Amino acid sequence: MFILLMFVLLLQEILANSRDENLTELNSVLEEPTYSYRAINLPAEHIPYFLHNNRHIAGICKQDSRCPYKVGFYFVLHKYLKKLKSCWGYEKSCKSDYRFSYPVCDYVESGWANDIETAQQIFWKQADFGYIRERLNEMKTHCKPTVTGDSSLTCSQFLQHCRATNLYIDLRTAKRNHERFKEDFFQKGEIGGHCTLDVKAFLAEGQRKSPLQSWFAELQTFTSLNFRPLDDGKCDIVIEKPTYFMKLDAGVNMYHHFCDFVNLYITQHINNSFSTDVNIVMWDTSSYGYGDLFSETWKAFTDYDIIYLKTFDSKRVCFKEAVFSLLPRMRYGLFYNTPLISGCHGTGLFRAFSQHVLHRLNITQEGPKDGKIRVTILARSTDYRKILNQNELVNALKTVSTLEVKVVDYKYKELEFSEQLRITHNSDIFIGMHGAGLTHLLFLPDWAVVFELYNCEDERCYLDLARLRGIHYITWRKRNKVFPQDQGHHPTLGEHPKFTNYSFDVEEFMYLVLLAANHVSQHSKWPFRVKHDEF
């Protein structure tokens, strides 16, 4: 009897434990969101625009009580309460009232436009989300699939950007030398897919064939294959993840390398995907490595290390989804030598890029500070364009109690790039000589001023970049108050203003800095806005 009683008690305990475990599992299932919202990982301001273009995710969010973006039936983001009508601007259904933003034009330049409205539209198409609309409208399928599972190749004009499915690349006979972008790297049959290629139309796209302007050289031998690479076992390696191919500009120069990152961001918009669960393959036909001083930035775009094309040498590789990214030096591209209409500034595209990178790299705004303007001076330790009387200028700034002055030298061996970005993003006035370091202006807060102390007669470079970002720009105005060390000594061109060092009149310098401080204090986004001329 005692044994029977013990058995009954043990059975009850087992059933109770089993019930508790089932309840725990059920609660776990109930608590689990129906979509991995964390993977979206976009700035809060961008979420409504993302959901506008991903209605299936918006639908899941609407039905999911645990969706972090849900604040009502048609609203997202408790912080902004933006309607799902919000759109970047390039979408066909996008109405102008719901665009992310629209540029400002202060005047009309003759030869470009007759009125402000036309000037705004031109600038929007040149350098804002209208630029993406133009690229989307150009997309053409050159290699068409016949049945489900076939390959495809779709490109913008001049093959500046392409998308491929079930792409076949044969690197078994790859021959590498010193050329980073060898034009005859592939022979017929070594790159292609099982699809129907319009050869004549495809080869007509080669008008801008150039290493950093087009993918024509790499794709000109694209072949319509008589086999299905994946189905017929022709692949030594199959890459399942979406893969971005990129031809990179100089990785040691911030200005040039950020042309790569900006164009990758634009490419993501074209493909409506900001996932970091992607591969990025550096397209380089040489046997060299690649020096990259800004490698931390890749974390904004991928969870994985950058792959070199040569990693696949001696293999036949098949990519289920491949994207050939927009390139850094395209004619009329962004932002290298881009011809821009004068008088206009403030693209939503470049502001969104800045927000995107800062968010993904966890760079936060720690200010601004009430009663203080944070001034950062970018020093140079290079041979040329040094500020000879830098200490004198800094001491003058420190006599103004409202200015909080910091001098930095962005040496990559001493200061990680993420820390450089943190300093830049927490500056209200950013001062530096002409040079690639001024590309940091992309990551200044909206109210900031960039002061190119002296442009060395290269007037448009950082002025135009500041216009794209929507940051106020000033530079030295009185030539008789800047003092070059000598005439400059270019290695081959002789006298050159970029190849010497400079001293500056302290009084004029202070006048310009105080003008900049006044602009900051009156900016609409400055939380401690003061009356005109307080500085």
Curated annotation (Swiss-Prot):
Glycans are attached at N22, N271, N362, N501. One of its GO terms (biological process) is protein O-linked glycosylation. Its main location: endoplasmic reticulum. GO terms for molecular function: protein O-acetylglucosaminyltransferase activity. Residues 1-16 form the signal peptide. It comes from the Eukaryota. It is an enzyme of class 2 (transferase). The keyword Glycosyltransferase applies. This is EGF domain-specific O-linked N-acetylglucosamine transferase.
